[in-house]
A protein has these predicted regions:
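Core of compact, soluble alpha-helical bundle domains
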Residues: 1-145
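Ferredoxin-reductase
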Residues: 141-229, 247, 283-284, 310-314
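Short, conserved phosphate/pyrophosphate- and ester-handling motifs at nucleotide-, phospho-/glycolipid
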Residues: 175, 257, 359
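A short, basic/flexible loop-to-alpha-helix module at the beginning of a structural domain
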Residues: 234-246
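Conserved beta-strand elements of the Class I
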Residues: 249-250, 355
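Histidine-anchored nucleotide/phosphate-binding helix
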Residues: 260-270
C-alpha cells in the first residue's frame, strides 16, 4: 500500500469511527454481506454480536496504524485468525470476509465512494484476508481446551477469583490473554488474562470484575459454581519482559488489570536473576487493591521487585462492609491520586521497558501522562482492549 493510499484509507476510516454510530453501521454492513453470501457462517457466532463489532473496529485500526510496519500487523492478524478457530472459522472463509469488508466500506460511503478508496480498501482487505488465511493454516493445535472450576472466591461484591483445572496444560505464556466461554453464556467468548503462569498440572486462575451492563462477567462473578466446565481457547497478546534488552521494568496495573503483570512476576520469581521491577498497583479505593498483600509477599523474597500502591481516594466507600486493612509493615506508603499522573510524577522512566494493563481509558490516560513527561512511546507496551 503506497503512502497516498494509506493516507486516504486512514482518513476514510477516521470519518467512519467519528461519525454517530459509524462503527456500528460499518460492522452491521460487514456481517450483512458476509452472512448473505455465506449463511452457514451465522450459526458459528453468538446471537449477540456487540463485542464482535468492537473487535473488528479495533483490529482494522491496529492494521492501519501499522501499515509501515507490516510484519507487526501481519503477526497480529495471524494471531487473530488462530483465535477465530474457536468459532469453527478456517482459512477458506477469509476470502469471503475480505470481500464482505470491502463491500461494507463501499456501502457505508455511498456517493462519496471513489476509485482511490476502492483501490486503497481493496488492497487493505486483500492483505488482511491473506494474512489471516496464513494464520489459520499455521496452527494445527486444538482450537480450545476444557477446564473445570475448582474454586470461586468473591473478593469484592463485584470481583471474583476463579481457579480452574484442565485435563492437559494450556500452552500460554505469562502476560498473554485467552478467550473463554462459560456454560451460563454459551458461544459468548470473552478475553481474560490468566493471573498465574502456565504449569504442568493444567491449573489456571482468573481475576474477573463485573462490567456494568455486560453479559459474561456478571454471570461469572454471580453464577459460577465449582464443577462448571469452561472452554478456553488459544492464547493471544505479547506482553513480556525482554530479558535481552538490559533494561529494568516498569509495570502499571489497575484493578483486575494486574493479572497479566502478576503472572509474569510469579514466573520471574522462579528464576535466579531478574531485572529490577517497579510495580505500581492502582485502584479507585483502597479495597480495590485486593491483591497488593500477595504482591508484597512476593517482593519480600525477591529484592528486585518494588511494590507501590496507588489510590484515587484515601478511604473506602461508605458501602464497603469491612474495616480498613492495615498495610503490611515495610511496604511503600500508599500514594493518592490518578495512577498515570502519580507514575509520571516520578519522571519519564526512559531507561525502562514499560507495561500498562487495565481498562482502555486507564491505559490511554497513563500512556498520555508518560509521553507528556518525555517517555519514548516505543518503550510502552499494552494489549488492545
Amino acid at each position: 500500500v503506497d503512502a497516498r493510499s494509506a493516507a486516504l484509507v486512514r482518513a476514510n476510516f477516521r470519518s467512519v469511527i467519528e461519525a454517530p454510530n459509524g462503527s456500528e453501521r460499518l460492522v452491521s454492513a460487514f456481517y450483512g454481506h458476509l452472512f448473505a453470501e455465506n449463511p452457514q457462517l451465522r450459526e458459528l457466532f453468538p446471537p449477540a454480536m456487540d463485542m464482535q463489532a468492537k473487535r473488528i473496529v479495533t483490529a482494522i485500526q491496529y492494521v492501519l496504524d501499522h501499515l509501515e510496519d507490516w510484519g507487526r500487523a501481519q503477526k497480529f492478524l495471524e494471531q487473530l485468525a488462530r483465535d477465530h478457530r474457536k468459532y469453527g472459522v478456517d482459512a477458506a472463509h477469509y476470502d469471503a470476509a475480505g470481500r464482505a469488508l470491502l463491500s461494507a466500506f463501499r456501502a457505508y460511503n455511498g456517493a462519496a465512494w471513489h476509485r482511490g478508496l476502492e483501490e486503497g480498501w481493496r488492497d487493505i482487505t486483500i492483505l488482511i484476508s491473506a494474512s489471516m488465511a496464513i494464520g489459520a493454516n499455521s496452527d494445527k493445535s486444538q482450537p480450545f481446551w476444557e477446564a473445570t472450576v475448582v474454586g470461586h472466591r468473591r473478593v469484592l461484591e463485584d470481583l471474583a477469583i476463579v481457579r480452574l483445572q484442565s485435563e492437559s496444560p494450556i500452552p500460554y505464556q505469562a502476560g498473554q490473554y485467552v478467550p473463554l466461554t462459560v456454560p451460563q453464556r454459551p458461544k459468548m467468548w470473552r478475553y481474560f488474562s490468566p493471573a498465574i503462569p502456565a504449569n504442568p498440572y493444567g491449573e489456571i486462575e482468573f481475576h474477573i470484575r463485573k462490567i456494568r451492563g455486560g453479559w459474561v462477567s456478571p454471570a461469572i462473578v454471580n453464577e459460577t459454581r465449582v464443577g462448571d466446565r469452561w472452554q478456553i481457547a488459544g492464547p493471544l497478546g505479547g506482553l513480556h519482559v525482554d530479558r535481552e534488552s538490559g533494561r529494568d521494568v516498569l509495570m502499571i496495573g489497575a484493578g483486575t488489570g494486574i493479572a497479566p503483570l502478576r503472572a509474569q512476576l510469579i514466573e520471574m520469581g522462579q528464576r535466579g536473576i531478574n531485572p529490577r521491577v517497579h510495580f505500581f498497583i492502582g485502584g479507585r479505593y483502597p479495597c480495590d487493591l485486593y491483591d497488593v498483600e500477595n504482591m508484597w509477599q512476593l517482593s519480600q523474597s525477591n529484592p528486585w521487585l518494588t511494590i507501590v500502591p496507588v489510590c484515587e481516594q484515601k478511604t473506602n466507600p461508605w458501602w464497603y462492609p469491612h474495616p480498613p486493612q492495615e498495610e503490611p509493615y515495610g511496604m511503600h506508603r500508599r500514594l493518592i491520586g490518578n495512577l498515570g499522573a502519580v507514575v509520571a510524577s516520578f519522571g519519564a522512566w526512559a531507561d525502562r521497558q514499560i507495561q500498562i494493563a487495565g481498562s482502555a481509558k486507564m491505559i490511554a490516560d497513563t500512556r498520555r501522562a508518560l509521553i507528556a513527561v518525555g517517555t519514548p512511546e516505543h518503550i510502552i507496551s499494552s494489549d488492545p482492549v
